[in-house]
Curated annotation (Swiss-Prot):
It comes from Pinus banksiana (Jack pine). Gene3D superfamilies: 1.50.10.160, Farnesyl Diphosphate Synthase, Terpene synthase, N-terminal domain. This is Monofunctional pimaradiene synthase. The lineage of its organism: Eukaryota, Viridiplantae, Streptophyta, Embryophyta, Tracheophyta. Pfam families: Terpene_synth, Terpene_synth_C. Keywords: Lyase, Magnesium, Metal-binding, Plant defense.
Length: 868
């Protein structure tokens, strides 16, 4: 009779046989009696046997131990791998008591009425989008008010604008944007208003107060940040200073700031290419009122926009009209005043800009599903005015604007419109740097941030997009080095946070709910825009967007929490929790699907995906670590036969695995039959048989210490990653009736699915191969490539795998962006599975080591922590 191991109290050499192949001696030092874990010093006669397993049978217990040098632990077969590889996995982070304690008590039904109201109001905003809504510009209104009556009388042609100036002086004596103070904006608007009032000999009190404000602040302008200087300020401000002198206004003309601006203007005037000034539309058209002494107004008329304006600027158009009497200029100004009544904005129309930004906002805030028709109408409008030579902020704007172009390319491509990126070449100089307008050298953080976002929807071979990505990353990293980088054109409160997020999480690491959560925290309902003057755009910056986004996020999160509770109950009842193959990772796995396929109507898809993933992870561990060859053979046979007849021959842990899989698959198949209208059990069983064949092959490699060829490994990885299996089961519950054509676009036959699997496997391997190698697994992309290229170092092989993954991701993006005949949810399930893998393996194994990576915080923010 064998002596029980727990009775050993001193050194005893034990010799045993490992499956008839190796005779090994173990020197056992037992620290205590009759405890479930022992410490053993192991020696082996064969270095090749260091990672083999010793199977010591003591009574009815199975005791196994790794063979190798040093100390190890000894316990039952469910704790130690039968192939001799032990994996220490940290306990689950989200235990019931922890997750329940931080789950929200939010009740979605309490918000239903308010959500309905907000959706209706935002839909109304979309429907009301005409030529663009924007706030008044005191500066431009002052220029329009200067136009004399056409009948020759000593009155303004637009007297209502003069009245607006008189009635809209701010309390400090200035004019300008009242919600945000910028000295540049206030001085420029105030100077324009006091000049106009003086011209019409009215408003002496307002003029006096305006002069006092000007004198007070002009002396401090040397300390004002240049990045708040409006477009064309260095041209229009000195020109108005000269006019103020001619009107004998008592202003501090000798202050250093005014002298510097005048000198700067003189230098820039000499640099203006007069030969092209009248032939090519440029941003000079936006501020012609500051260039009257050098331009020929009659010649400049040929660059007038179809709507009669000069680059949508009322001030510039008013100046040209006063110089030429051009009737189209007057028609434009009449058109603007019919729209706004007694004032004008700093630029109008803004129809393309407004629509693109409104679509971008609702999408990034995660509320776009409520506005499908409105989004399509807006994008159809933009696309109908799309010009491959470039577009600006308005349909008839002759000067391309990189912010609009980059945002337009990105959004239109994501919605399957065919647009080229070639126009971006016109914004690039000879050094590969990109700027705001063609041929100019100004740019801002927002411009470069939107260009960076655009570069991530590049197709393979689009050189200009690759150059844009490199350029913008350089620029944005440099911007972050500033203590408080403020964008010259878009005065956002949280621009730093947006830049940091974009650089850390590029598009292929960005899951929809994480994007939503981040943007909710950074969206500014009161953000101010800076063009020629500061202004706000109510259809772009509106608290309704943010309020709806917060309510919607918390409502969806509450739904997800209920689903998670049900999944945790299932996890416990399945028996998986007792196996110790994998600590509780229900929350992390549910997060991976809920952060992408988040819509309430996809609840069954999320549950099915989570259960299937947990089955996959458990079975991967069983095949890879915990099961013997005989165990695996028995399990495969049971799955193929799909009945209970083999259960009596199975050890408990195998029986638990089979019963859990059996019940899950049958449950899914029954629900799938209702969704698809026919029996889907054979389809699902076939997927699992293919998956388990792949696991079996990798287990055989591991036992034989076989390193396959790189090609063989990559081909096997397309299945062993399990992503196709999970997608092809989950897609049954996306609300689509699956035809063979749809399946052919996302199953093993498709390049789309293959690239999803390949990139997922490579992301996994790059972060886990060292740990897996340390426990005896010899097959990974890195090791297989090194076997075929022995002259390479490990670092060089790893670098190659990263390049391979980047190229595959580029191809994968193209497949996603160009696939038109696959339903949206089906496409998203494939695409976001790949993105999820890129995020989860960004820092390491985000599933197994979630407590050490940012995955823990991501899970908390998406599943447990409501937005305030």
């Amino acid at each position: 009779m064998a002596m029980p191991l727990c009775s050993l109290t001193s050194y005893n050499p034990i010799t045993t046989t490992l499956r008839g192949h190796h005779f090994l001696t173990i020197n056992a030092y037992v620290k205590t009696q009759c405890i479930p874990c022992f410490f053993i010093k192991l020696h082996t006669r064969s270095s090749a046997s260091k990672q083999r397993i010793i199977d010591l049978r003591s009574g009815s217990s199975n005791i196994v131990a790794c063979v190798g040098e040093g100390a190890t632990s000894l316990s039952s077969h469910s704790d130690i791998m039968k192939t001799g590889k032990r994996e220490e996995i940290p306990p689950g982070v989200w235990k019931d008591d922890i997750s329940d304690s931080i789950m929200s008590s939010h009740k979605p039904e309490a918000d239903e009425k308010r959500v309905e109201i907000l959706i209706a109001e935002i839909k109304s905003m979309f429907r009301g989008m005409g030529d663009g809504e924007t706030t008044p510009s005191a500066y431009d209104t002052a220029w329009v008010a200067k136009i004399p009556a056409l009948d020759g009388s000593d009155h303004p042609h637009f007297p209502q604008t003069l009245q607006w100036i008189l009635q809209n002086q701010l309390q400090d004596g200035s004019w300008g944007e009242g919600t945000y103070f910028s000295a540049y904006d206030r001085l420029l608007a105030t100077l324009a208003c006091i000049i106009t009032l003086t011209v019409w000999r009215t408003g002496q009190t307002q003029v006096r107060q305006g002069i006092e404000f000007f004198r007070k602040h002009a002396g401090t302008m040397e300390d004002e940040a240049d990045n708040h200087q409006p477009i064309g300020f260095e041209f229009v401000f000195p020109a108005m200073i000269n006019e103020a002198k001619s009107l004998c206004l008592d202003l501090p003309y000798d202050t250093p700031f005014i002298k510097q601006i005048i000198e700067k203007r003189e230098a820039k005037l000499k640099m203006i290419p007069t030969d092209t000034l009248y032939t090519v539309p440029t941003t000079f058209l936006h501020y012609l009122e500051g260039l009257q002494e050098i331009i020929d107004c009659q010649k400049i008329i040929k660059l007038q926009s179809k709507d009669g304006s000069f680059l949508s600027s009322p001030a510039s158009t008013a100046a040209v009209f006063m110089c030429t009497g051009n009737t189209k200029c007057l028609e434009f100004l009449n058109f603007v005043l019919i729209k706004f009544g007694n004032h004008v904005p700093c630029q109008y129309p803004l129809d393309l800009f407004e629509r693109l930004w409104a679509v971008d906002i609702v999408e990034r805030l995660g509320i776009d599903r409520h506005f499908k028709k409105e989004i399509k109408d807006a994008l159809d409008y933009v696309y109908s005015h799309w010009d491959e030579r470039g577009i600006g902020w308005a349909r008839e704007n002759p000067v391309a604007y990189i912010d609009v172009m980059a945002t337009g390319i990105r959004i239109l491509r994501l919605h399957r419109y065919n647009v080229s990126s070639d126009i971006l070449k016109t914004f690039r100089d000879e050094n590969g740097e990109f700027y705001r307008f063609p041929g100019q050298s100004e740019r801002g953080v927002t411009d470069m941030l939107n260009l960076n976002r655009c570069s991530h929807v590049a197709f393979p071979g689009e050189t200009v997009m690759e150059e844009a990505k490199l350029c913008t990353e350089r620029y944005l990293w440099n911007a972050l080095e500033n203590v408080n980088p403020l964008d010259k054109w878009d005065l956002k409160e949280n621009i730093r946070g947006e830049v940091e997020y974009a650089l850390k999480y590029p598009w292929l690491r960005r899951l929809p709910r994480l994007e939503t959560r981040n943007y909710i925290e950074h969206y500014g309902a009161n953000d101010v825009w800076l063009g020629k003057m500061m202004h706000m755009m109510p259809y772009i910056n509106d608290r309704k967007y943010l309020e709806l986004a917060k309510l919607d996020f918390n409502n969806v999160q509450s739904i997800h929490q209920k689903e998670l509770r049900e999944l945790r109950r299932w996890w416990k009842s399945s028996g998986f929790a007792e196996l110790n193959f994998l600590p509780d990772r229900v929350a992390e796995i549910f997060f991976s699907i809920a952060s992408s396929m988040f819509e309430p109507e996809l609840a069954t898809c999320r549950a099915v995906y989570t259960k299937s993933t947990l089955c996959t992870v458990i079975l991967d561990g069983f095949y890879d670590v915990h099961g013997s060859a005989e165990d695996i053979m028995l399990f495969n046979e049971a799955v193929k036969r799909w009945d209970h007849s083999l259960l009596d021959r199975m050890p408990e842990h195998i029986k638990t695995c089979f019963l859990a899989l059996y019940n899950v698959v049958n449950e899914i198949a029954e629900e799938g039959r209702k969704r698809q209208g026919h029996d889907v059990l054979p389809y699902i069983r076939n997927l699992w048989e293919i998956q388990l064949e792949s696991f079996t092959k990798e287990a055989e490699w591991s036992r034989a210490e076989h390193v396959p060829s790189f090609h063989e490994y990559i081909e096997a990885a397309a299945i062993s990653s399990a992503l196709p299996t999970l997608v092809l089961i989950g897609v049954i519950f996306t609300g689509e009736v699956l035809t063979d054509h749809i399946l052919s676009q996302i199953d093993y036959r498709s390049k789309f699915a293959y690239l999803m699997s390949l990139t997922g496997r490579l992301a996994n391997d790059t972060k886990t191969y060292q740990v897996e190698r340390s426990r005896g697994e010899v097959a990974s992309a890195i090791q297989c490539y090194m076997k075929e290229n022995p002259e390479l170092s490990e670092e060089e092989a790893l670098e190659y795998i990263y390049r391979l993954m980047e190229n595959a991701l580029a191809d994968f993006k193209r497949e996603f962006l160009k696939t038109k005949d696959v339903p949206e949810y089906c496409r998203r399930l494939v695409f976001d599975n790949a993105r999820s893998m890129q995020l989860i393996y960004m820092e390491g194994d985000g599933f197994k080591l979630s407590h050490e990576t940012e995955i823990k915080e991501h899970v908390k923010k998406i599943l447990f922590e409501p937005v305030a």
